[in-house]
Amino acid sequence: MARRLRPVELDFTASAPVRLVFSATLAAPPPTVYRSLAVEVGSMPSWFTAVASAVPSADGAGRTVRLRGGIVFEETILAAEPDTRYAYRVDSTNAPGMAALTEEWTLSPAGRGTRLRWVMAADGAPPFRLALRLAGPGVGLSFRDAARRLDRRLTPARPPSPGSVR
């Protein structure tokens, strides 16, 4: 059964009781990474294995995300700033104990690539907050795996160096 969550705004990413923050450097440039995050929403399961499906709303102002474990998020996009930031709030979910959740992806140039930063900001009942804090290392592992998969998806394979064996 889906429940409505507290309608927080972007500033919640800085003030939430629980904040999980992860970052990675990708070889692809910011416009390419941003396109995968914000435009090609349906491609998310191909690089973020915790996600079973991601479908944009008809008006483009939100999306529905289903996780592999059965959790469903109905989301509203809070920021869609090409090549720099993509953020959304969860409006309703079937996840127990959650009261508010916002996620923000920020992109910045890193040489020819992108520094990708993901903030998951949440609030909920005390057991939920504790569980999320304890899950932090696993969420970080999932993020690092997603960043690697996204990087492989966006970066074309290089031809072998002359004289190398393949």
Where do the model's predicted regions map?
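Short aromatic-glycine motifs in intrinsically disordered, low-complexity regions
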Residues: 60-68
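Hydrophobic-ligand binding "helix-grip"
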Residues: 45, 49, 53-54, 68-115, ...
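Hydrophobic ligand-binding cavity/cleft-lining segments
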Residues: 1-55, 166
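Short, P/G- and charge-enriched loop/turn segments at secondary-structure junctions
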Residues: 8-12, 63-64, 92-94
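Short structured motifs
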Residues: 7-8, 19-20, 59-61, 73-74, ...
